[in-house]
């Protein structure tokens, strides 16, 4: 058994300010990698800039990361970073900016290399330091080595083959407080997917399942808010973010499985948000698991059966998807031996079609 999670995690209120010295110690010139607006609205960008200025650390802002970032975006940021002389990267936002930050850190260290380096398993590139500041409750990317990028050349999403764990993660639930409910819903469903897929996984271990158990208990305690019965509180925001971090710790060991593999086609071809695309396959995936594992997860999440789980996800994060797109997703994952191997039960064509057959769609 191996448990490797080298990220130093600070999880507390105002942690960017409280640990500004640790952030500033990563280098002398930061490339702040984020999306176009959310980090400006939730206050995280201001906190980071203040922290850097307090310690007289220079910074350059790259705020052009799109949802499901592309290799082309990584290369654009790499060129800016190299030209400005940055020596560390801060990813702030959801999974897209943090995943992009990891890939950018690799490419800045290899300024003459082409984008193919990110997917070249024969190479062993170095990278500059990375800090992560998550502002959604789904990615878990702040504690994983994975960077998922869009490959327009092959019309899908793919993980960079090189593992890049952030040096530090600064986790503060306050950045969720003004997020749109839809964003929280979709990312919370993604976190649930990480937790379920890590537990029902060929690579699951006592260490990864320990993280899952903690994460599911926290996630379940937030159901009154997620279902619309309560308003978002600071305590609930903290629990949602921490559940997501536990999910990241779990998939750092196991990786994700079939539902994530199925989701990529829906996101790329159907423009369906990642969390929502992952969520619609969870009940079908869990239904096929060993009875003891299935009952354990249902017990921790407070659902009586997989149908209840599926209905909750469908109400929380509704999706309208055609049968044709679902079938293309099935075909794609059946040609992904790595995702199939991560499933602890035989994931043949019959099983995959059964999983997509149980999808609950809106509209």
Region roles according to the model:
Residues 72-174:
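Glycine/threonine-rich beta-strand-loop-alpha-helix active-site module
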Residues 138, 248-273:
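Glycine-rich phosphate/pyrophosphate-binding beta-alpha loops
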Residues 298, 302-363:
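C-terminal charged capping/lid subdomain of soluble metabolic enzymes
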């Amino acid at each position: 058994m191996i448990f490797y999670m080298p990220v130093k995690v600070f999880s507390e209120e105002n942690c960017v300010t409280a640990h500004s010295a640790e952030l500033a110690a990563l280098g002398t010139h930061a490339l702040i990698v984020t999306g176009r607006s959310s980090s400006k609205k939730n206050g995280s960008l201001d906190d980071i800039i203040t922290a850097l200025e307090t310690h007289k650390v220079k910074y350059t802002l790259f705020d052009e990361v799109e949802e499901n970032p592309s290799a082309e975006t990584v290369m654009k940021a790499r060129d800016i970073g190299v030209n400005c002389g940055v020596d560390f990267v801060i990813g702030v936002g959801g999974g897209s900016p943090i995943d992009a930050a990891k890939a950018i850190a690799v490419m800045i260290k290899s300024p003459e290399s082409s984008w193919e380096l990110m997917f070249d398993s024969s190479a062993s590139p170095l990278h500059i330091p990375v800090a992560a500041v998550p502002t959604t409750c789904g990615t878990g990317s702040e504690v994983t080595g994975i960077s998922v990028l869009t490959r327009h050349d092959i019309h899908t999403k793919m993980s960079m083959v090189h593992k890049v764990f952030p040096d530090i993660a600064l986790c503060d639930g306050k950045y969720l407080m003004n997020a749109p409910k839809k964003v929280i819903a979709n990312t919370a469903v993604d976190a649930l997917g990480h937790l379920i897929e890590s537990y029902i996984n060929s690579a699951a271990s006592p260490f990864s399942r320990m993280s899952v158990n903690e994460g599911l208990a926290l996630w379940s305690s937030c159901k009154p808010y997620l279902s619309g019965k309560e308003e978002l509180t600071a305590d609930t925001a903290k629990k949602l973010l921490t559940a997501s971090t536990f999910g990241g710790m779990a998939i750092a060991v196991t990786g994700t499985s079939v539902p994530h593999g199925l989701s990529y086609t829906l996101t790329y071809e159907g423009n369906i948000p990642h969390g929502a695309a992952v969520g619609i396959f969870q009940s079908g995936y869990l239904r096929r698991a060993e009875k003891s594992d299935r009952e354990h997860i249902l017990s921790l999440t407070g659902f009586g059966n997989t149908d209840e789980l599926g209905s909750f996800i469908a109400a929380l994060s509704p999706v309208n998807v055609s049968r044709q797109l679902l079938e293309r997703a099935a075909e794609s994952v059946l040609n992904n031996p790595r995702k199939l191997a991560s499933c602890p039960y035989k994931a043949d064509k019959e099983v995959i079609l059964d999983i997509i057959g149980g999808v609950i769609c809106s509209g």
